[in-house]
Amino acid sequence: QLADIFVRRAEGGAGYVVIDAVTVDHKYWYIGKTTALDKDSLVPQFKKFATRVKDAGSELIPQIIHPGPESICAMKGITPIGPSINTNANGDVSRPATIKEIQKIIKQYGKAARRAEEAGCGGIALHAAHAYMLPGAFLSPLRNKRMDEYGGTIDNRARLILEIIEECRKNVSEDFP
């Protein structure tokens, strides 16, 4: 059903079609049935999706995310993670991500980018806007109260998204946007 919606957008003349909120880790949901690119086994399904969009005259662009503090994962018994302790719109309180977790998430972004390319997507988009999702929350001085290499100065707060971009670039071909 979801694919049909995006194919109709492509048929309507869109140059590219962004499928939003494609998570790098299915344990951290953003919305009810979050689309994910966190397993190699999902590539064939995404390939069919990307092919349908391409056949309709467009390119599929997954917006790769980790919902971080906006995760809806309480029903799974998982505490949302973020740069610092914050309360999300659902009233869930996130805990600060450890350096080890941050490094794992960076790798997950790179793998998701590789999977998107393998599936024939036209590129990827990374969500880091308005203090939302994990990278955006790290950028925000209001949400990021860390005092390590991922907090404090703007250079440190930007470190996560810059490392994510670098990891994505390492995992895809030079001409994959």
Give residue ranges: language-model regions:
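Flavin-dependent oxidoreductase catalytic cores
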Residues: 1-177
